[in-house]
Amino acid sequence: MPADKVDVSYKKLDDNHSAVNGSATRKQIEITFSHNGIERKALLLMYLPNHVKTKVPVFLHFNFQGNQTVSSDPDIIPSQYSDRPRGNQASRWPVEKIIDAGYGLATIHYFDFFPDSKDRYAESILALFGHPSEGDIPADGGQAIAAWAWG
């Protein structure tokens, strides 16, 4: 990935202190990446335990079907690139168990960094670095896996 500086801004969209039956604070944060006159947005979903009053370790993991799939919580903002049903991956995301153990959980839909489809390359984070199409990538440039790692 290029060493170019990318401007990053954050906008808190949600800060609910009674999520997960009152045991967690749910935050939803829109992250905006800007460079070369181009912007890309990612939506971070985070749960933090309410019973721990100090900083906590947080599991950070991409999700593959959209933020709304990790829980049946009706207030999770759906991912922009996913129409998957709310909660359909909840069995793979032990949110309550993680919170009860005193950890946090943060997730972002991987499509927010690189939609996993060649015809949507221009929508990826790589466009910020002057690579609007797959044909514009230098020989040592990254593609999907590099974009996900960068994210």
Predicted features by range, described:
Residues M1-N50:
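Non-catalytic accessory segments flanking enzyme active sites
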Residues V6-V8, V20, V52, V56-V58, ...:
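Extended aliphatic helical segments
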Residues D14-A19, T54, Q68, H131-E134:
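A generic structural micro-environment signature
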Residues E39-K41, K53-T54, S71, I108:
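Short secondary-structure capping/junction motifs at helix and strand boundaries
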Residues L43-Y47, T54-Q65:
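Short beta-strand element of the alpha/beta-hydrolase
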Residues H61-G151:
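Cap/lid segment of the alpha/beta-hydrolase catalytic domain
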